[in-house]
C-alpha cells in the first residue's frame, strides 16, 4: 500500500465508522422498544395533532420519546399528514416506528368515554350503559358495596361526585366498575392536590366539603370568569351561617320529581338538599366537578358579595345587599329597567 493510500485510509475510515455508527444508533432508536412505566400506556390523540404534539403527549404519559426524532421520522416516512385522531395504546415492545405507523393507519385499538363536568351519577351510569365496548357489570353490584370500595375519603354518603369528569381511554371489554374505580382514583388525586393548595382561611372543614361546594359552583357557573366570585359568595354565606339558597341543590333533591321548571312550592318543599330550608352544605355533592371548580371552592375570591343572579348571557350580577340584589333580579329576571 502506497503512502498516499495509507493516508487516505486513515482520513476516510473514521468518517465511515462515524457515519456507520450514527446510522446504527438511528436504526436502533427507530426500531428499539420504548421504555414504558407499565404494561401499557393510553394516549388520546386529539384532532389536528402533529407529530410534535403527539411526542409531547407520549412524554407526559411517562414514556421518554425524543420529540425531534419522532418529527423527523414522521416526515421521512411521509406519515406526518396521515395521523388519525383517537385513543391508542402503547404496549411493551412498541418502537417509535410501530407507534407512528399505528397512528397513521388509525389502528385505534383502544376505546374512550367522556364524563362531562357537571354530570350527575345518573348521567355517568347512562354513558357507561350505552357504550358498546364496555362490559356491563354494575347491575351485579349494589351502590352500597360500590361505595365501600370507592369511598377513599371515608366521609362520602353516596357515590355522587366521586368520579372525576375526564376522557378515559380503555381496552375493549373493560368493565364499567373498573372505569368508575379509575375515575374515583383520579378524583382522589386531584382533590388531594387541591386541598393541599387551599386558602389558609378556608371555611371548608375537610376535602369532602370541598367536593360538595365545588359541585354547586360547577352547576352555578355560566362563565369561567365568574367562578371564583361565585365561590366567594357561597363562602361568605357559610361563614355567617346564612342559607346558601342555590337552585341546583333543590333540583337535585327533587330527583325525578323535577318538571324542568323550578316552582315556588319546590323551594318550600324540604329535602336534605334544599338549601332554601336548611343551613349549610347539602349532605353530598350534586354533580361531578372539574379542577377549576375545586380550585375556586378552596381559593374563593375575597369580597363582600352575598348575592348573585344570572344575567341571561352566562355571566352573573353580584350584590352586597338584598335591595341591590332585588334590583338585579328586576333587571335581569323580570325584565324591568332599574
Label each PLM-derived region with a short phrase.
Residues 10-23:
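Hydrophobic membrane-insertion alpha-helices, especially the h-region
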Residues 22, 27-191:
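Signal peptide-directed extracytoplasmic domains
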Residues 1-7:
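Short, Lys/Arg-rich N-terminal segment immediately upstream of the first membrane anchor
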Residues 9-13, 40, 81-82, 119-123, ...:
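Short low-complexity stretches enriched in small and charged residues
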Residues 50, 126, 130-135, 149-338:
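Bacterial extracytoplasmic/cell-wall-associated proteins, especially those involved in peptidoglycan
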